[in-house]
UniProtKB/Swiss-Prot annotation:
This is Protein wntless. InterPro entries: WLS-like_TM, WLS_GOLD, Wntless. The lineage of its organism: Eukaryota, Metazoa, Ecdysozoa, Arthropoda, Hexapoda. Interacts with wg; in the Golgi. Interacts with Vps35, a component of the retromer complex; wls stability is regulated by Vps35. The keyword Transmembrane helix applies. Residues 539-556 have a biased composition (Polar residues). The gene is wls.
C-alpha cells in the first residue's frame, strides 16, 4: 500500500506546503484587518411628527414623508404638549432612510445586502392623570407601513413594501421625574428585518391607534421621541467578502476533483475518512459559492435564510468530520472490518444532527416567516424572547461541550500514540525513524485541528450573541471584527484544502522485499537518507489492511522486525 501524501512527502516539500498555507492564512487576516471596513454599520433616525390625513388614513398606497417635494405637514413638540389629548390619533411618526449627509441625498446600495430596524421608545405620564407608571409587560399596538422608492423616481412615488398591525411588549424605566410629568425610556424592540436591500430609499410610517372599545394603547401616556436604529451590512465589507469567496471557490473545487481522482485510481473502495473529506469539501464549496452576486440584480429576500442554511450545512459537516477524524485515528481497531458511520459513529453524529436540526427549526420559525411579514419577530413577546434567549444560550453551551469532547477524543489519540511508542525501541532503526516521523507530522495536524475547532466554536458563539444583542438589549457589546471573520473563513478553506492534499493517496510505488538481505539493504538506505532533509516516509513492507488510508492507523498491529 502506498499510503497518503502526508506519509510520503519529503520534509522540505512539506515545509514549503505548510509555509505557503500559513502565509495565505496571514493574508486572510490582513485582508480583513487592513482593507475591509467593519462588517456592519448603523444609523439612528429620529422620528418626525406628521399630521394625519384622515381622508386617506386607511389607504395603504398613501404615505407621509418628511423630506422632498410634497412632504407632510410637520407637528412640533410644543403643539403636542399644548393639546389636551396630545393629538391622539392625529400623528404619524415618519422615518425616512437613509439620512442626508452634508446636504447631499444618500441612497442605499445593494452591496449593503440587508436592513434591520429596532425602535427606542420614550413616553411620558402627566402628573394629573390617574395612570402614573406603565404596567409590567406593557403591550403596544403599532400600525406599521414600510415603503420604498428608487433613484430617479419622483419624491412622492413611494410604493408599499409591507403593512401590518403588530404588538410589542415594552420594559420601561423612569428616566426623568418632573413636577408636571414622568418620562419613561424603554428597551429596544425589534421592528423589521429585510433579507434584501434592493431599493434606494425606504420609508416607515408608524401609527399608535387609541381605541377605547378594543382597549388599544390606553395604558400609555403620550409619546415623546421615537428613535429608529437602522442596521445594515457595510458595502465595503461585502466587496471584500465576495472577493474572498470568488478567489477560494475554484481552488476548493479543483482540489476536490484532484483528490477524488487519486482515490479512484486505487484498487480498493474509498475509506470512510475519504468519503468524509469529500462531503466536507462539498459543504465548503456550497458555502463558497458566491450567490450574493445575484442579489445585485435580483431581489432575493430569502438571502439571509439561505446564508444561514448554507452555513448550517457546513457547520454540521465540519463538526461531524472532526468526530470521525479523531475516531479513525484512535488506533483502536477491534476488528478488521471497514469503519462505517452506522457501526462506529452514529451516537456521536446523532447529537450533532439533532442540534443542527433544532437550530434550523428555530431559524426557519423567524426568518422563514419574515419572508411573508418582515415585521414578525420571535423576540416580540416575553415568552418568545425567553425561548429565543434559551436557544442562543443552549447553542453556546453545546458548542463549548462539543469542543471539550473533541479535546477529550484527541487526548485519547495522543495517549494511545504514547502507549504504542514504547514499542519503538524494539524495532529496527529504519522502522523507528519511519514511525517517529509520522507521529510528529500527525501530532502537528491534530493540534492544527484543535486550533481550527477552537476558533470555529468561538466564532459561532460570538456570532450568535452579536446577532441577538440588538434584540435582547443587554449592556454587553460584541463587535465581530472584519479581521476575525475573514481570518476564520480563510482558515476553514486552508484547513480543508490542506487535508484534501495531505490525505490524498500517494501513488509512489515502493519495491516489495522478499529476502532478508534485501530488507537489510533497504533499511540501511532509509537510515542513511534520514540524515538529510529529503527523507521520504515510505511504507515499509508489512501486511497492512489494504482498506486503511494511513499506515499510522495500523500501528497497533505492527510487529517489530530486525
Amino acid at each position: 500500500m502506498s499510503g497518503t501524501i502526508l506519509e510520503n512527502l519529503s520534509g522540505r516539500k512539506l515545509s514549503i506546503l505548510v509555509g505557503s498555507l500559513l502565509l495565505c492564512q496571514v493574508l486572510c487576516f490582513l485582508l480583513g484587518g487592513l482593507y475591509a471596513p467593519v462588517p456592519a454599520g448603523h444609523t439612528n433616525v429620529l422620528g418626525s411628527l406628521c399630521r394625519e390625513n384622515h381622508a386617506r388614513q386607511n389607504d395603504t398606497s398613501f404615505f407621509l414623508y418628511s423630506r422632498g417635494e410634497g412632504s407632510c405637514t410637520q407637528v412640533t413638540r410644543e403643539e403636542v404638549e399644548q393639546d389636551s389629548m396630545k393629538l391622539a390619533n392625529q400623528i404619524v411618526h415618519v422615518f425616512q432612510m437613509p439620512l442626508p449627509r452634508d446636504s447631499r441625498v444618500l441612497d442605499y446600495s445593494r452591496w449593503q445586502q440587508n436592513l434591520i430596524g429596532v425602535l427606542q421608545v420614550e413616553f411620558g405620564y402627566d402628573s394629573s392623570s390617574e395612570l402614573r407608571e406603565p404596567p409590567k409587560e406593557l403591550q403596544l399596538t403599532i400600525d406599521m407601513r414600510l415603503a420604498y422608492r428608487n433613484k430617479g423616481d419622483p419624491d412622492h412615488a413611494w410604493k408599499l413594501y409591507a403593512h401590518g398591525v403588530e404588538h410589542r411588549y415594552l420594559d420601561c424605566v423612569a428616566a426623568h421625574i418632573g413636577s408636571s410629568e414622568t418620562l419613561y425610556t424603554c428597551d429596544m424592540i425589534p421592528l423589521f428585518e429585510l433579507g434584501a436591500l434592493h431599493h434606494s430609499f425606504y420609508l416607515l410610517n408608524l401609527r399608535f391607534p387609541l381605541d377605547t372599545p378594543k382597549q388599544m394603547n390606553l395604558q400609555f401616556g403620550h409619546m415623546h421621541d421615537l428613535t429608529l436604529t437602522a442596521i445594515h451590512q457595510n458595502g465595503g465589507f461585502t466587496h471584500v467578502w465576495l472577493m474572498l469567496k470568488t478567489l477560494l471557490f475554484p481552488f476548493v473545487v479543483g482540489i476536490m476533483v484532484w483528490f477524488w481522482r487519486r482515490v479512484h485510481l486505487l484498487q480498493r473502495s474509498p475509506a470512510l475518512l475519504e468519503y468524509m473529506l469529500l462531503y466536507l469539501g462539498g459543504a465548503l464549496t456550497f458555502l463558497n459559492l458566491p450567490l450574493e452576486y445575484l442579489s445585485l440584480t435580483i431581489e432575493m429576500p430569502y438571502m439571509l435564510l439561505l446564508s444561514d442554511i448554507r452555513q448550517g450545512i457546513f457547520y454540521a459537516m465540519l463538526l461531524s468530520f472532526w468526530l470521525v477524524f479523531a475516531g479513525e485515528h484512535m488506533l483502536i481497531q477491534d476488528s478488521h472490518n471497514k469503519s462505517t458511520i452506522r457501526s462506529r459513529y452514529w451516537k456521536h453524529l446523532s447529537a450533532v444532527v439533532v442540534g443542527c436540526i433544532s437550530l434550523f427549526v428555530f431559524d426557519i420559525s423567524e426568518r422563514g416567516v419574515q419572508l411573508r411579514n418582515p415585521f414578525y419577530s420571535i423576540w416580540t413577546t416575553p415568552l418568545g424572547a425567553k425561548v429565543a434567549m434559551s436557544f442562543i444560550l443552549l447553542a453556546g453551551v453545546s458548542a463549548a461541550v462539543y469542543f471539550l469532547f473533541l479535546c477529550y477524543m484527541i487526548s485519547k489519540v495522543f495517549k494511545n500514540i504514547g502507549d504504542k511508542r514504547t514499542s519503538l525501541p524494539s524495532m529496527s532503526q529504519a522502522r523507528r525513524l519511519h514511525y517517529e516521523g509520522l507521529i510528529y507530522r500527525f501530532k502537528f495536524l491534530m493540534l492544527a485541528t484543535l486550533l481550527c475547532a477552537a476558533l470555529t466554536v468561538t466564532g459561532f458563539i460570538m456570532g450568535q450573541m452579536a446577532e441577538g444583542q440588538w434584540k435582547w438589549n443587554d449592556d454587553v457589546e460584541i463587535q465581530l471584527t472584519s479581521a476575525f471573520l475573514t481570518g476564520v473563513y480563510g482558515m476553514w478553506n486552508i484547513y480543508i484544502f490542506a487535508l484534501l492534499i495531505l490525505y490524498a493517496p500517494s501513488h509512489k510505488q515502493w519495491p516489495t522485499m522478499h529476502h532478508s538481505d534485501e530488507t537489510t539493504q533497504s533499511n540501511e538506505n532509509i537510515v542513511a537518507s534520514a540524515a538529510s532533509e529529503e527523507i521520504e516516509f515510505s511504507n515499509l513492507p508489512s501486511d497492512s489492511n489494504p482498506s486503511e488510508i494511513s499506515s499510522l492507523t495500523s500501528f497497533t498491529r505492527k510487529v517489530a522486525f530486525e
